[in-house]
């Protein structure tokens, strides 16, 4: 079965600030996006990668396509993450059986995790990594606690999220007017209960400058 990846790199990083989207900033001697691209490139399970970037960053897209042989196509993403993923799915329609969707601002994925997710999707249809909540979780409205959620049932979801292609494509088609915050929700709405693989907290998304400082420390200390 053919497996492809969609690498979402079209975010402008409004919460992060600055003129350069965070996925194109350098961590030591390479861009943040290159860390995850290296893992997808190395995996024997991955047959091709579609890269979605913001307008104005064509030179970076061309550079990455030249550097990584499995990047088969690049294009512009949309205004919202969901628009970007939908564009990637349209590009890959009819080209693969399984698709892995990953946020390029998560540099610290492992080959072991990626291939475990792909292997498990054969029987579970939709699989994603996640971490169990350590802190007590409150549901808050307008700055006031409404209730406390059971921590033992709370999981913080990461990427890559892996799907049978036809399933996630159908979810995006049926709920195309929704702007869910992750891709799992599109198949959950179809009645699927995705499988979660417990993963390391190091697979965090770089969203703020504080996150970047942590990522820099991880790389500088040789932990990655």
UniProtKB/Swiss-Prot annotation:
Q: Which CDD domains match?
A: CDP-ME_synthetase
Annotated pathway: Isoprenoid biosynthesis; isopentenyl diphosphate biosynthesis via DXP pathway; isopentenyl diphosphate from 1-deoxy-D-xylulose 5-phosphate: step 2/6
Cross-referenced Gene3D superfamilies: Spore Coat Polysaccharide Biosynthesis Protein SpsA, Chain A
Catalytic activity, EC: 2.7.7.60
Reactions it catalyzes = 2-C-methyl-D-erythritol 4-phosphate + CTP + H(+) = 4-CDP-2-C-methyl-D-erythritol + diphosphate
Instruction: Give the Pfam families listed for this entry.
Output: IspD (PF01128)
Keyword field: Isoprene biosynthesis, Nucleotidyltransferase, Transferase
The cross-references to SUPFAM superfamilies, in alphabetical order and at most eight, read: Nucleotide-diphospho-sugar transferases
| Keyword match Repeat | no
> Tell me, what is an example of a GO biological process annotation in this record?
isopentenyl diphosphate biosynthetic process, methylerythritol 4-phosphate pathway
UniProt-annotated site: Transition state stabilizer, residues = 15, 22
Q: What class of enzyme is it?
A: transferase
Molecular function via GO: 2-C-methyl-D-erythritol 4-phosphate cytidylyltransferase activity
Signal sequence span is: none
Q: Where is this site: Positions MEP for the nucleophilic attack?
A: 151, 205
The text of the family note is: Belongs to the IspD/TarI cytidylyltransferase family. IspD subfamily.
Record's HAMAP family? IspD (MF_00108)
| Protein task | Catalyzes the formation of 4-diphosphocytidyl-2-C-methyl-D-erythritol from CTP and 2-C-methyl-D-erythritol 4-phosphate (MEP).
Official protein name in the record = 2-C-methyl-D-erythritol 4-phosphate cytidylyltransferase
The source organism is Caldicellulosiruptor bescii (strain ATCC BAA-1888 / DSM 6725 / KCTC 15123 / Z-1320)
């Amino acid at each position: 079965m053919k497996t492809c990846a969609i690498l979402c790199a079209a975010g402008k990083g409004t919460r992060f600030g600055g003129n350069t989207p965070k996925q194109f900033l350098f961590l030591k001697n390479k861009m943040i996006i290159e860390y995850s691209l290296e893992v997808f490139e190395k995996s024997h399970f991955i047959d091709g990668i579609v890269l979605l970037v913001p307008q104005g960053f064509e030179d970076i897209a061309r550079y990455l396509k030249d550097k990584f042989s499995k990047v088969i196509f690049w294009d512009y993403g949309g205004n919202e993450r969901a628009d970007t993923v939908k564009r990637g799915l349209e590009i890959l329609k009819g080209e693969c059986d399984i698709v892995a969707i990953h946020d390029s601002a998560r540099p610290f994925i492992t080959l072991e995790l990626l291939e475990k997710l792909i292997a498990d999707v054969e029987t579970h249809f939709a699989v994603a990594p996640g971490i169990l909540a350590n802190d007590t979780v409150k549901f808050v409205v307008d700055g006031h606690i409404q209730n406390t959620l059971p921590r033992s049932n709370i999981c913080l979801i990461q990427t890559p999220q892996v799907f049978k292609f036809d399933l996630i494509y159908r979810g995006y088609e049926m709920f195309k007017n929704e702007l869910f915050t992750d891709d799992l929700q599109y198949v959950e709405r179809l009645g699927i209960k995705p499988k979660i693989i417990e993963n390391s907290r190091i697979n965090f998304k770089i969203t703020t400058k504080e996150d970047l400082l942590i990522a820099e420390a991880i790389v500088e200390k040789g932990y990655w």
